[in-house]
Regions:
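C-terminal catalytic domain of Rieske-type non-heme iron oxygenases
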Residues: 2-342
């Protein structure tokens, strides 16, 4: 088709927008990936406290523009736009077979895009190639984003993808089982609202122009979901992203080195503290070369650094088992409760 020769307008060379990028392998099919990124209505709920908030949720009226769904894809418009209209209208374009982008000219804020190339890898597996071009009118957000290390940006983007992963893997297995029993996608999934217009348009394109909607042999997708993945497999970051990312793999290596240094330094400081305390017991009047309090502070600092570095290292390996949307914070008690729900 034509996506190989196409890019979103603001991604072309010579534009004035800055750009953030991400590549990640995902444990669900290319079609499920595109369906998910086209669906704007789920964002305030699934991605609560990562990139959105439930308070921004509400009716979503999407329109597929003329000439509708063609072999080249389709275009759409959300007139109200995100955050209950506070940012202005958002346009969407699907360029067959694997490119889609949302474009938002936010009122008084600037231009932001979400651009996704979805690539089939194997039945039940896909690769996301995403770009996030932006141009903010205000200087502070431009400065913050441009000066945030890429690996920190990637960990945030990993987290957004992990918000969906449990739902999407289970949804895909359900749909594959229904289709194996002779149901169509429309029979397996009830989507009567205009918020589903983009998903329905994409599924219509799959059915009309891809000889049945899947690049795989019949039954291949169902076979790919014959065993349920573990939570750690679904939330894997190392093999799905870090291993192949120059920024994140280098940061992981540096984090592990710093962790070793913190551990060795902490042990050395603890041994020195023990020696100082022993010397004080043996020779109470003798002057000590180093203050025991300074050594104790060094031990505490190294222990703190080691714990933090271990947490950073884990962020390169696997995502958190509890999504942010399931962290309920009590303002009165200033405490948080973690609920183990998908």
């Amino acid at each position: 088709m034509n996506a190989h020769a196409s890019t979103a307008p603001h991604c072309r060379a010579g534009t004035s927008l800055s750009d953030s990028r991400l590549a990640q392998d995902l444990p669900y099919d290319y079609s499920t990936l595109l369906e998910n990124v086209l669906d704007v209505s789920h964002v305030p709920y699934t991605h609560h406290l990562t990139v959105s908030n439930r308070a921004n949720g509400g009716p979503v009226e999407l329109s597929v523009l003329e000439p509708g769904v063609t072999s080249s894809g389709f275009s759409g418009m959300w007139l109200e736009g995100p955050r209950q209209g506070k940012l202005g209208s958002q346009s969407t374009k699907f360029v067959a077979p694997g490119l889609m982008y949302h474009s938002l000219e936010a009122k008084g804020l600037g231009t932001t895009l979400t651009v996704v190339f979805a690539t089939p890898v194997a039945p039940g597996r896909s690769r996301l190639l995403a770009r996030f071009p932006f141009r903010f009118n205000a200087a502070p957000p431009r400065f913050i984003i441009k000066n945030t290390p890429r690996w920190i940006q990637h960990q945030g983007q990993n987290g957004v993808l992990e918000d969906d992963v449990v739902f999407l893997a289970q949804q895909e297995a359900f749909v594959a089982a229904a289709e194996a029993q002779g149901q169509t996608y429309a029979q397996a999934c009830f989507m009567p609202l205009r918020q589903d217009a983009y998903v329905l348009a994409f599924r219509q394109w799959l059915t009309r122009f891809t000889q049945g909607g899947s690049p795989w042999q019949p039954g291949a997708l169902l076979a790919a979901h014959s065993t349920s993945p573990t939570r750690d497999q679904l939330l894997d970051r190392y093999w799905s992203h870090t291993f192949n990312c120059t920024s994140c793999s280098a940061a992981l290596k540096n984090t592990r080195t710093a962790s070793i240094v913190a551990a060795i330094t902490g042990v050395a400081a603890a041994l020195a503290l023990t020696a100082c305390l022993a010397a004080r017991l043996i020779l109470p009047a003798a002057a000590l070369p180093v203050s025991p309090l300074a050594l104790l502070a060094a031990v505490a600092a190294c222990a703190f650094a080691w714990v933090k570095l271990q947490a950073i290292e884990k962020g390169f390996l696997v995502g958190p088992s509890i999504p942010k949307r399931n962290l309920i914070t009590s303002k009165k008690a200033n405490t948080s409760t973690k609920i183990r729900l998908v």
